[in-house]
Every structure is written in C-alpha cells, then in structure tokens.
Amino acid sequence: MGRDIPDNETWWYNPTMEVHPHWKQFNQVPDAVYYSLGIFIGICGIIGCTGNGIVIYLFTKTKSLQTPANMFIINLAFSDFTFSLVNGFPLMTISCFIKKWVFGMAACKVYGFIGGIFGLMSIMTMSMISIDRYNVIGRPMAASKKMSHRRAFLMIIFVWMWSTLWSIGPIFGWGAYVLEGVLCNCSFDYITRDSATRSNIVCMYIFAFCFPILIIFFCYFNIVMAVSNHEKEMAAMAKRLNAKELRKAQAGASAEMKLAKISIVIVTQFLLSWSPYAVVALLAQFGPIEWVTPYAAQLPVMFAKASAIHNPLIYSVSHPKFREAIAENFPWIITCCQFDEKEVEDDKDAETEIPATEQSGGESADAAQMKEMMAMMQKMQQQQAAYPPQGAYPPQGGYPPQGYPPPPAQGGYPPQGYPPPPQGYPPAQGYPPQGYPPPQGAPPQGAPPQAAPPQGVDNQAYQA
C-alpha cells in the first residue's frame, strides 16, 4: 500500500468533521470494500436485533425462565440488541454505501459512546455469567449465599456503572471518539499518542478487557476441572450405585461434556470477538503505527459487531428451557436451525427428573444434574470417611458404632430380615457385611453369645 498522499482525496475527505492525519496517507479504498462491509454490517445488525429481540421476548414472557441467573442473559441480550441497533444497522450500513460518515461530529460522539458502553457491558456481563456458573457448578457444596433476584440486580447495576465509567471519559476529554478504519464508523481514539489518549487506552485495556477476561478464564477453567474430577470420581464409585443413581450418573456425564464444550466455545468466542481490538489499540500506541492500515483497523470492527449474533446462540440456545420456549413460541426456528426435536424432548425429561428451581440459582438442567450428582457423591464419601475402614474394629457398643451410617454395601446394614446383634456381641449369621471383619475377640460365626460381664468388670478378667 502506498505511503504518499493520493491526489484523489475523496475517500477520506469529510466536510462535517476532522479526519486524523494518519488515515490520509493511505491510498483510495476500493468501492467493493465499502459495499461488502455495508452488506456484512447490515446482515449482522438485522440478525443481531432479531436474535436478541427474540431472547428478550422469550425470557420476559416465559415464567420458568425468569430466574435470578437468567437476568444476566436478559441483560446481555439487551446490550447486544442495542449494540446491533445503533452501532450496526442502520448508521454504519448507510455510511458504508455512501462511503463516508455523513452524520456529523455530535452523532459520531454519541455513536462511539453507545458502542463503547454496550460493548463493554456485553463483555462484563459475560464475566458475571461465568461467576454465576462457577458458583453453581464449580462450588455446589460451598456454604455461600444462593443467587437471588436482588443479588443479580445489584450485579447488573455494577455492570452498567462499570461500563459507563470507561465509556464516558472521551466525552469529557479523556481520550476522544473519532473516525476509524475506512472512516464509516466512530470509536475510541487509539491513534493519537498524547498522554490523555494513551492513559485512556491503557486503563481500558487493563480494566475493561484484561480484568473481565481473567474472570472468565478463571471461572471456566475451574468449571472444566470440576467436571473432569467429578467424572473420574463417579467412574470409581459407579459400582456402588443403584439403577436410579446410575441413570443420574450417566445423565450427569452427558451434562459434564456439554458444559466443558460450552466453556471452551465461550472463551474462544470472547477472544475472537475482542482480542483484535485490543491488539490494534496497543499496536497503534506502542508499536509501528504504519501497520495500522484502514483494513487492519476495520477487521476488529467486524469481529466485534458479529459478537452480537453468536452471544444469544451460545448463552441462550444452549439453555434447555429456552429451547423448549422456542419450540412453543417459534417452531419455525426449530425447523430452520434444524434443532433435534428428540433433544428438546430429552431436555424436557431432564428438567422433569432434576428441576432447576429458583432457590438453586435458576441453573439449567445440565447444571442441576451435575449439582445433584456431586451432592450424592459427597454424601457417599462422607459415609466412607465416617465408617471404620477394613481391618479396624468397632467399639464394644455394637456394630456399626452408634451414630455411624451403614457401610455402602449391597443391601445396606443390617441385611434385610436380620435383627441387630445383642449389644456388645458380634453379629450373628450374615453379619458383618461382606468385607468387614468381626470385632476382636468375637466368638466364631454361629456360636451363641456369651453373658455380658457385670458393669465395671473387665471383659477379659470376666471371661477368665
């Protein structure tokens, strides 16, 4: 690409506002680029508004979806809906077909501010969703407060305040909102290398990008580790499960795989959507600025605009009750997107067997399945820890020791139809359960019980 200022200035000349000198050094942008970009942004805007609008409609209409955890999904859909409506179609689409921004400087600032606040809100809401899922899946047994509508509302208020804080600075002179790329849209000024702009970009990079991404990485990494460890432990304990528990274990294993896959997709989607913007901004401030061409600056815009499309797909369509609501209200979407009707029915069955209640945080059936399986597994582990291990002997007070749960043996303890042994004596025939030795000094199996020693008399002296 040439570095000399071209004679034909029509591509960057704008009578309504100033254009940064950096963009004037590049040659004419072909018309095909403008038209292709306009079509792409228009499609993203229409699909983003439609998809997120459906999400908002279904989550507000369907009572079973109105849980505290799903308030984050609604907030994400609202921010993406507004992001698509204002920052995509129609303003940028019209500008692309006209081949320049025609709405003036004031509209440029409003456009940049709305894009900033709702773009950052989308990022921060995703981090809140990851925190909620981590609390439900990664720490199901923790003695922490359950998610409530009030707590979710306060977290959403924090997201709005956080996003506004980092978006309003350029309005008051800490940075600026200017034209970027092929000069058909406005965003944060990352080209100017003065102290105000540089500090604004660095702070936004740390607090508005790195901070949320660290939260997302931490939460989903621990979710994947939790489901992986849970799968190994359930495999080791599978032989002790009855038919109903085994069914739940198999359902939980399927839920684990879904959750792990969704976690990987979420992190990948986040990086693909917002990392290009961060890279270009840092490159413009600290690297060879000539590398930031109109095309290099415009690519991050396309990735960011597209995030408003796949966010509802990842966060909403993966929700079993949401798919059920789609099937009831918009059956044509099921046909169009080729959702498996059997999968929708399976989701209904899963929700029936293991319901996700508001008291449990409103998690999906997959999360509820896993939570119940982990609770069952922990209960069995507690029983094992409380009961004397093989080779140890219970006290004289009977078998099992008073207050101890029965061992996790088939049929439980005592075996069905057998009365408990006399206090202080070893079990009769059929006792103890297979694999557990009798107390030390017990008479052989089948021998009649001996008389108990008088109170205060040593047992060995009494027998002698």
Curated annotation (Swiss-Prot):
Gene Ontology cellular component annotations, sorted alphabetically:
cell projection; membrane; plasma membrane
Q: Which GO terms describe its molecular function?
A: G protein-coupled receptor activity; photoreceptor activity; retinal binding
Query: Which residue stretches does the UniProt record annotate as biased composition, category Pro residues?
Result: 416-425, 434-452
| Annotated GO biological process | phototransduction; visual perception
Lipid attachment, kind S-palmitoyl cysteine: 336-337
Give the record's glycosylation annotations as residue positions.
8
Membrane topology classification: Multi-pass membrane protein
- Low complexity: compositionally biased ranges: 367-401
Disulfide cysteine pairs (residue numbers) = 108-186
Task: Enumerate the UniProt keywords alphabetically.
Answer: Cell membrane, Cell projection, Chromophore, Disulfide bond, G-protein coupled receptor, Glycoprotein, Lipoprotein, Membrane, Palmitate, Phosphoprotein, Photoreceptor protein, Receptor, Retinal protein, Sensory transduction, Transducer, Transmembrane, Transmembrane helix, Vision
Q: Which residues lie on this side of the membrane: Extracellular?
A: 1-33, 98-109, 173-199, 284-293
Matching entries from InterPro entries are given as: GPCR_opsins, GPCR_Rhodpsn, GPCR_Rhodpsn_7TM, Opsin, Retinal_BS, XYPPX
Q: Which residues cross the membrane?
A: 34-58, 71-97, 110-131, 152-172, 200-224, 262-283, 294-315
Main location as per UniProt: membrane
Q: Which residues form a coiled coil?
A: none
**Describe its PTM?**
Contains one covalently linked retinal chromophore. Upon light absorption, the covalently bound 11-cis-retinal is converted to all-trans-retinal. After hydrolysis of the Schiff base and release of the covalently bound all-trans-retinal, active rhodopsin is regenerated by binding of a fresh molecule of 11-cis-retinal.
* Location of the protein in the cell: Cell projection, Rhabdomere membrane
Query: Which CDD domains did the record assign?
Result: 7tmA_Opsin_Gq_invertebrates
Q: Where is this motif: 'Ionic lock' involved in activated form stabilization?
A: 132-134
Region of interest (Disordered), residue spans: 344-464
What is the recorded function of this protein according to its Swiss-Prot or TrEMBL entry? Photoreceptor required for image-forming vision at low light intensity. Light-induced isomerization of 11-cis to all-trans retinal triggers a conformational change that activates signaling via G-proteins. Signaling mediates the activation of phospholipase C. Subsequent receptor phosphorylation mediates displacement of the bound G-protein alpha subunit by arrestin and terminates signaling.
Name of the protein in question: Rhodopsin
Q: Which organism is it from?
A: Sepia officinalis
